[in-house]
Structures are given as C-alpha cells and as structure tokens.
C-alpha cells in the first residue's frame, strides 16, 4: 500500500493533467479586450527528449520517444505530430537539436507564435537536406509572403544539428550550429511587422505537399507528397528555452501589440536578459526567396495554423479572423522544473540559522534553561 502522501500527490498530478487538457481558449488581443493572460515561463529550461516526454509540452499526433529523442512521424494524409509549450516567453532564446524529416512535400517546423499572431519560424523542406527556411510575420499580416529566406543547413536530415532563434526587442537572430545565418531588426522588418508579443513554442512535422492543400502550398513544400515512400520522421533530441522576462503571466495592456504595452505579472519584461543578448549582430539579413506569393493568403488559416499553414489543418478563415489558442495553464501550486517537467512547488528549505541551538542539545538542557527563563 502506498503512503497517503504519495496517493495525494498522484491525485494532484492527475488533476493537473486534466487542467492541462481543459483550459484552452482562443482570443486575439488586437480585436478583443479582456483576453486571458499567458502563462509565463519566466526562467530557463533544458529538455532532454532522450529521457522521454515532459508535461510542459502538450503533444498531439504520432510522437514516440527513445534514446534518439522525440520522433514525429508523418505516415498518411492528415498526420501533423506536434509538441506545443504550455508556457509563453517574452523575448528569449530557443535552441533545438534535431534531424529534419526527409521526403518531398514533408515539412519539419519550429514556430514561435503569439496570441496576436506575431510569428518567428524555421522550416526544413524534406525535398532538400541542405537548407532551412527562416521567416517572420507580425500581427498575422502575410501581405505577399515576401519575408521567407533560405539559409544553408547542410545534411540536416542525416545528423543532429542545433538551431537557435534568439529574440529581443532589438533583433531576431537565426543560427545554424554556431553560425548566424540571418538577422532581423525593427528597422529592417516590414512596417509594424517586427514580432514583439509573448510567444508560445510549437514544433513538429506535417505534409505541405498533401493533395488536399492549395497548389501554392504544395509548390512551396516541393511536393506532392508520396506517402508510399514513407513514413517520414523528424527527430528532436532536445530543446532549451530561456525566457528573457520574469513573472508568472504575461498580459496585453492594450490593443497595440507593442512590446512596451505587455505587462509581466509578478516580474518584469526584459528582467532576465543576458549581457550577450545586448550586442547587435553584424550578419546581414538573408535575401528573400521571392517577391511574389508562394502560399495564397487565406489558405490553412485555422485557429491553430501559422502563416505558412502549420500545423496542417484545412481551413477557410481570412487572416483578420484568425485567433490563436492560448494553451493550457499551470495549476496553482505547481511549477516548471529546469528539466521542463511540471512538478509541485517545493517547500521552502529550513533555515538552520533561525533555530535556537538549545533545540539541538537534547530535552534536559532545553527544559533547564526554560525553567530559569534565561537563554544563551
């Protein structure tokens, strides 16, 4: 029989999982007042998927775990295995170590996206293992999809490579290994398009080349996808996330979408920015791939879709109608550990210096001094 304290903890954990599954809402702060605050990470975590799953990332689709890490498999039409953080960051750094999925039309994706549809992306097309596409959007405005750029990432399907997105109020820096491949600043971004609101993190694989997609999407993904050549698997070894702000929640102060309007409840925006992040990178922004649309506007713009259509979900909403799920929250009394696990908040350690030393000397000594009412 388990001790009662273990049973209580188990019950609480089950309740926590139930909370994760039920507390979803969709609200775009640009169009709606009173949107719920976003759960803040407020710290740094290092998640090792070779040790299994963690409950700070909510999974959907076919995801398995082994000594290589988390595997995201696309085997048939409609498959889009995804892990989504239950937390948000307000500026920060995301480092993912992974192998991209092979296959024409197959897309491996890392997305940072906010409730008001700011977005920072890295996407690997399975038809070419030598490059990665970097992209960004602001407030859900796709204009003519003219911001994507392809950057070198040799042998990205054959070996584990660490990719980094570092995002501050002054710049977004994309890196492959230790090499900076692209830099974006507010000055070089399209007007009012610099990403600057709290971001949720999603990553996984999907089929941009699926026959049900629009012709523009299939062409961009270098499809079509031939599922008989599959299954197609993306493998993620680890993900490290550092939130450059502090607090428990991030809240939109108005409908501007400007970072200066974001409130960090119980902390401060930019309260955890390392000195290294303050230096402006000198690498030039990579050239865009095209000035014409490669994915028609309005395609795959469902409640959970990014501007490039990930995760793959059929939808017909226009960009202005799109909302974004705020994701699950962390139950009261629980926190995210440095390994990315949801755990009970630890009890405060006992401060030995505040304990009267007589309590450590045995009952006779204690009661002797208590009787004469004189304490050392």
Curated annotation (Swiss-Prot):
It is a lipid-anchor; GPI-anchor. It holds the Pfam family Glyco_hydro_16. One of its GO terms (cellular component) is side of membrane. Chitin binds at residues 123, 202, 206, 217. The active site is at residues 119, 123. InterPro entries: ConA-like_dom_sf (IPR013320), GH16 (IPR000757), Glyco_hydro_16_CRH1_prd (IPR017168), Glycosyl_Hydrlase_16 (IPR050546). This is Crh-like protein 4.
